[in-house]
């Protein structure tokens, strides 16, 4: 964090960890990790995906609950106004790009489809979090500036303790 933020009191206190943690996995689907797809050839996303796979091994071994989402639509009629052409062309139910990356996916995870940037927006996620008794979330996924950011903001807004796992988040742009 830059000195400017520190000087005005950012990070002057911490939220710490609560009683029970869970891991949120945002959009680690083949569209972003498989070079066959327009958005899938970025090395920094592959590194973050591989780091996420390692984190998930540890989390699952510790019996932490994991929720994972992917993005897909029935048609352009139920799709937000994405400016990303590849999303408008490929992100439809049944398209290979919407499948979860096999390095990430585990059948024991709570996996569902979302249709907006946040994992929370009009999805069953908060119900699952309450049922699991989760009060702290570790957020992983892509893209950091879009869907990860939206998920983090909503998690914070729901009163959860939010930990962004930087090495497990990726974006088209560095920084």
Predicted regions and their residues:
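Internal catalytic-core helix/loop-beta-alpha segment
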Residues: 94-142
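A short glycine-rich beta-strand->turn/loop micro-motif centered on a GG-aromatic cluster
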Residues: 138-141, 156, 161-174
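Active-site acidic carboxylates
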Residues: 1-106
């Amino acid at each position: 964090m830059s000195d400017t933020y520190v000087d005005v009191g950012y990070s002057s206190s911490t939220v710490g960890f609560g009683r029970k943690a869970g891991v949120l996995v945002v959009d680690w689907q083949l569209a972003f990790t498989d070079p066959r797809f327009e958005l899938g050839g970025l090395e920094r996303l592959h590194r973050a995906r591989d780091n996420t796979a390692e984190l998930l091994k540890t989390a699952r071994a510790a019996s932490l609950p994991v929720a994972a989402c992917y993005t897909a639509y029935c048609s352009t009629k139920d799709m937000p106004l994405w400016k990303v052409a590849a999303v408008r062309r490929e992100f439809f139910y049944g398209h290979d790009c919407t499948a979860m990356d096999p390095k990430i996916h585990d059948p024991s995870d709570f996996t569902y489809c979302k249709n907006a940037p946040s994992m929370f927006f009009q999805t069953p996620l908060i119900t699952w979090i309450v049922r699991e008794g989760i009060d702290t979330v570790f957020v992983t996924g892509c893209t950091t500036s879009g869907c990860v950011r939206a998920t983090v903001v909503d998690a914070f807004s729901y009163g959860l303790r939010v930990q962004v796992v930087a090495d497990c988040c990726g974006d088209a742009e560095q920084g």
